[in-house]
Curated annotation (Swiss-Prot):
The RNAP catalytic core consists of 2 alpha, 1 beta, 1 beta' and 1 omega subunit. When a sigma factor is associated with the core the holoenzyme is formed, which can initiate transcription. It comes from Streptococcus equi subsp. equi (strain 4047). Its EC number is 2.7.7.6. This is DNA-directed RNA polymerase subunit beta'. Its cofactor is Mg(2+); Zn(2+). DNA-dependent RNA polymerase catalyzes the transcription of DNA into RNA using the four ribonucleoside triphosphates as substrates. It catalyses: RNA(n) + a ribonucleoside 5'-triphosphate = RNA(n+1) + diphosphate.
Amino acid sequence: MVDVNRFKSMQITLASPSKVRSWSYGEVKKPETINYRTLKPEREGLFDEVIFGPTKDWECACGKYKRIRYKGIVCDRCGVEVTRAKVRRERMGHIELKAPVSHIWYFKGIPSRMGLTLDMSPRALEEVIYFAAYVVIDPKDTPLEPKSLLTEREYREKIQEYGHGSFIAKMGAEAIQDLLKRVDLVTEIAELKEELKTATGQKRIKAVRRLDVLDAFHKSGNKPEWMILNILPVIPPDLRPMVQLDGGRFAASDLNDLYRRVINRNNRLARLLELNAPGIIVQNEKRMLQEAVDALIDNGRRGRPITGPGSRPLKSLSHMLKGKQGRFRQNLLGKRVDFSGRSVIAVGPTLKMYQCGVPREMAIELFKPFVIREIVAREFAGNVKAAKRMVERGDERIWDILEEVIKEHPVLLNRAPTLHRLGIQAFEPVLIDGKALRLHPLVCEAYNADFDGDQMAIHVPLSEEAQAEARLLMLAAEHILNPKDGKPVVTPSQDMVLGNYYLTMEDAGREGEGMVFKDKDEAVMAYRNGYVHLHSRVGIAVDSMPSKLWKDSQRHKIMVTTVGKILFNDIMPEDLPYLQEPNNANLTEGTPDKYFLKPGQNIQEVIDSLPINVPFKKKNLGNIIAETFKRFRTTETSAFLDRLKDLGYYHSTLAGLTVGIADIPVIDNKAEIIEAAHHRVEEINKAFRRGLMTDDDRYVAVTTTWREAKEALEKRLIETQDPKNPIVMMMDSGARGNISNFSQLAGMRGLMAAPNGRIMELPILSNFREGLSVLEMFFSTHGARKGMTDTALKTADSGYLTRRLVDVAQDVIIREDDCGTDRGLLIRAITDGKEVTETLEERLQGRYTRKSVKHPETGEVLIGADQLITEDMARKIVDAGVEEVTIRSVFTCATRHGVCRHCYGINLATGDAVEVGEAVGTIAAQSIGEPGTQLTMRTFHTGGVASNTDITQGLPRIQEIFEARNPKGEAVITEVKGTVIEIEEDASTRTKKVYVQGKTGMGEYVVPFTARMKVEVGDEVNRGAALTEGSIQPKHLLEVRDTLSVETYLLAEVQKVYRSQGVEIGDKHVEVMVRQMLRKVRVMDPGDTDLLPGTLMDIADFTDANKEIVISGGIPATSRPVLMGITKASLETNSFLSAASFQETTRVLTDAAIRGKKDHLLGLKENVIIGKIIPAGTGMVRYRNIEPQAINEVEVIEEAEATEEPAIIKE
């Protein structure tokens, strides 16, 4: 066997008959499988041991030779080689076909490769191959055309006319094989190249296609006649197994049936040929053989599929590879693993951030080999078998050993669906009683887990390296930031938020107000003994607090705070300021001076003069976490998060907040507000009946009236709410619920959407406290049901989008430090109309500059060229009034097969510069796909019938962008740079004409009458600018402008969709995806290169080909950039393994085989498929050959011969 981690590339070609014979260990002559009495394989049958190897290890068929000592001997009685039974997975056989047979992939695929090679139509080929017509192979002196078809009758007539042997015509695959042998590739290619110089239209397209196929044959060294099979390989028997079921019946792979049919027909054909049977009978048998081989290779591709029992189509070789259940996706890309388990999850509020609770009975099973090794080492048992029995009996001593074994041995927890890399994280196991896995509450957000019955899977990394990687790269405590936007993903929620909110509340006039304490302990003691309330404002000596970054003017003073805030600040990292107010100024600049007593001031007066601060809400906690991370990185942050969690749980328990129906307030003036609205609606309807407004206007006015009524109720609700009301506290703190939920409980439910998406005029006037009437209930259930179905559909769509995104970008890896490009991307804030969707500051953070940035007024250099822009630097640049900056970007990176560190910038998940080997393509795909489920599914209708453009938004728009489809509601763009000189309306054709005057000429654009104009007369427009509202078609923009403009446009469009839904995604992720869509060019004129016109190729390969020609003084080729959708881009990737495992498996493999494609295994997917370590992170080639050195030699435990189990060797 080849060492799987050492080889460089993998090639696929057509197999020549001699190649197939060299693979084979013998010919399969009989259709038999196994003997029904002995259940042993039949001789010369499909499971023959002589051909494929023994069924039992080191044992021949007749039993003469048993045991390993006869290794390699061929038995003289039965002819079976004594070897491992595993060879039955790799030894192939063959069938000598008595008539040539065409390979259906090459004849039936689109485009038909056989047809293009011979310049015949697939229809004509089919007639010949399936014996419906003769084809003229050599007309000799007759006036017949070569390759022309003759029916049976015409053939007989021509024979009579010209005499026997005057010309050669045949039928069947044999005829095609003769024709293919006669193809002279070199002359044909030369002729086609000549023809291309003059050909146009359909002729040119066909010539380019033929040239492509012929050139592929010529360059790869494949011979066209190998598309016809004379010998059929038989795959190893263990890959088409036959197993005995409980009832004595057998279950066999469908392939055996298909092979049996081929063998039966082949043998019958051989017999007919021996008997010199009449031509028509032989012909019919040959046709049946052809159909049998077709069914074996791809059942159902031509005609009706061959069916098994219960009219189920049999699974052929092609079906074994295709689709989700095929070899690629089922077994190569998704394997099941041992040392894994799954269970329901429960909350583990006492765990540390890096821990998870594992039930004892799960742990003992998962860590069994480690425990057994330790039992033997401590001599509790003499050998492995005895140790195993100890574990199975549940001996008391194993639990102590288990405790030691799991110490510092991380496990991986995974929750499906794994939408991004935070769906699998590593934890240190803690043994617990019970049967549920315990999960730390703060990692729930990353997993999107809750405890309503979710299940999670647990995996054990076995090798030292795997454990080290789990600990260093995947430990949950390290994953504070979300890779998609660099914001903390572990913000506390629910009870934790509520507890800290309650803790930091302030209240006037509570017991103990105005007391002064010497230090924290005294204050807490007073609180515990009931002398002072948690929310009372008291004084404390500043000097008793540890270094909290006090200003010099604040030292040695008394500070006004509350006992709750003293406790809250006690868990903060020491170097954060004392947090008194929930705002960024206090967090970054220090505690405000107004809370400190000047000498001689009365504390009560100071307290009375201070306003009551609002408590710390979820958002404020998020800011504190982000600031902590910025200053202290992961270790301190995760410790702080644990303290925050414990404090929150403790105080939300102490607060004892409960919710009852009495907590829902009654709005005093609800009846008046609703009465007024009814009155207004009546007036609107009156006006409509009198013909003063259209039905559309009336509808809009009525719905607006009810909307305003609901808002008035909401406003009144907010005005009258009691800040100590538990529901209000939950809502205000961000623990659960929002104002809209609250107003449905206490105000009114408001307007509902009807099944057709239109908003109904009848609002639901009741709220949930009053209760809904039956009709109101009916109206509201519709919305709830629609929500459920939408979510279900959206999840599937979003998952498929993620799969396509991962596929197109999986080979984008950080390959080098700096690509040295001189290009950059000019960026400014992304705007949508007047609104800013993404500010310049956000776009600059974590990127490298391309040129130095100067202050627009003073000219001072703010930051040099090729420098990393930090968060503070970005703010400084924007504050200076800079509006656009040229940065290094993935779009302009010159690295082949990936990106360089400088063009990418920082890794958002760590906040540091990205490392070489980071798989940024996969991260980008996950970052864009994961929030997909949060996007809406709908197409918005603009109110009224005023416009006919529906703006696609949400998930459908994202798919439209990434698949480069023509958008709905397409905008008209100008191809001329100049001034809009006139917009004329033509009522007869219901269109408008826009005239743009440029330097070189005038552009005239016809626009639909109903389209909303974006430009006015006198506006200056650039090439590619939109004249009307709507989405620009990117392919059209590419024709008018350059690649960079298209890339910038697509980036802005993606950001608009996500940001409008409140989802933030780093620009660089979108850049990675968009760059993959534009990495190919189409060759227009080959010049002096040997490129073919019309071929798609990588920009880098195209540039290389041109460089060579220019150096030798030739004419370089010209090309045009091509924008491909992500599905097309995945299928056009240089790796045939990756493309074949994605979609259209047979088409990809057919094409790759003819071209003799080489896969250089640069991406992640192709390496996973062949079981090689992936070329990212520690798997990069540069780290591949490092051998771990053992520091202390470990004794190897030998094992008694008597046991049947292999010894477990200590790592």
